[in-house]
Amino acid sequence: PKSRIEWIIIDDGTDKIEDLIESSNIPQIKYFKYDEKMSLGRKRNLMHTKTTGAFIVYMDDDDYYPPTRIEHAVKMLQTHPKALCAGSSIIHVHFKHIGKIVEFGPYGPNHGTAGTFAFRREMIENSTYDNDACLAEEKHFLKNYTVPFVQLDPRQTILVFSHDHNTFDKRKLLDN
């Protein structure tokens, strides 16, 4: 149920959203603001210290997540009890500058992009991100892709948006 979802927001942006959080009246939101810009690895590790749930499901602020995102990810972890982490090795990226959605992947059975991750609490008790990682942070967290993993349906997981402020310029994906 939605009442059991804990929303952790780590806000290190220049345009803080504290006013939106306060006016939302959603008690499950835990909002933490920081003046310094953080690397993705450090931000994800920090967020992990703020969570209390049995399952953690990522939802980055600049992508679209379907309404089925959380339910699908948790059910996949529940039906695959040996998997510590779930994610999608296939992603769909919307490129505004060309007006197209392009599919990338799959990259491997134990691979997923971090924005698609959902995992058991046990995962963060045994693994961390490289604090200095600004992109491709998944490899360290997934211990060189050896963590027991289950693939999620990409259409129930994420639609990535390519924009000028991405930590990685996703337009470079089109060069391959």
Predicted segments with their positions:
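Short, acidic, metal-binding catalytic loop of nucleotide-sugar glycosyltransferases
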Residues: 1-4
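Glycine-rich, basic loop-to-helix element that forms the pyrophosphate-binding segment
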Residues: 34-51
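Conserved nucleotide-sugar donor-binding
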Residues: 52-53, 111-127
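Short aromatic/hydrophobic "clamp" motif used to bind/position activated sugar donors
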Residues: 56
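The conserved acidic donor/metal-binding loop of glycosyltransferases
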Residues: 60-64
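Conserved donor NDP-sugar-binding/catalytic core segment of glycosyltransferases
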Residues: 69-100
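A recurrent flexible, glycine/aromatic-enriched loop bordering the glycosyltransferase active site
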Residues: 84-86, 98-119
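Acidic donor-binding loop at a coil-to-helix junction in glycosyltransferase catalytic cores
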Residues: 133-141
